[in-house]
Design a protein with these regions (language model features):
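Enzymes that bind and transform nitrogen-containing heteroaromatic metabolites
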Residues: 1-168
């Protein structure tokens, strides 16, 4: 039984921190990956996702991104002049058949999705570990809401369930 989406969206920044720019090539998976990146992935990082993913879609506004020098049949590039998540998701659906996608990113990208009201379901896993500091990213980073009138900029979702995982 499939328990996860077959499309995963991540940021190049987080993936670079996880070491994809220096990792050896992985085995192919049935999951397709979308990476939003302007300058964090190098050629090895791009090839890593070409090896890993059924389909690899890079979204970038960088005309000199290393992905443009890679020739792999499963590599697709969406070039944007500026970030438009709504347009990118529409293109993922129309051009690549992406109906559902899991977004696993940092607070800055999460903030953009939230402010464009593009979340329709959220799974939050909270690990029993406390990490902090004023420079530590949070679940939603980005520009702060400054007034009550700005609450309309974010969507409200209904809590469906709260489940404690084993060994947590």
């Amino acid at each position: 039984m499939q328990t996860t989406d077959l499309w995963s969206l991540n940021s190049g920044r987080v993936q670079a921190k996880l070491g994809v720019n220096t990792k050896e090539m992985p085995d192919k998976t049935p999951v397709s990956f979308v990476i939003i990146d302007n300058d964090h992935l190098n050629k090895n990082g791009v090839l890593y996702f070409c090896s890993l993913a059924k389909e690899f879609v890079l979204i970038t506004s960088n005309a000199n991104h290393p992905a443009f020098d890679v020739d792999e049949s499963n590599l697709h590039i969406i070039r944007q002049n500026g970030p438009s998540l709504k347009e990118a998701l529409a293109e993922l659906k129309s051009e690549y058949g992406c109906e559902r996608i899991t977004i696993q990113s940092g607070g800055t990208l999460n903030s953009l999705f939230l402010h464009e009201k593009l979340f329709d379901y959220i799974d939050i896993v909270i690990a029993p570990v406390l990490i902090g500091g004023k420079d530590t990213p949070t679940l939603i980073d980005g520009k702060s809401l400054l007034s009550e009138s700005e609450l309309s900029k974010i969507g409200v979702l209904k809590l469906q369930e709260c489940m404690v995982l084993k060994k947590s």
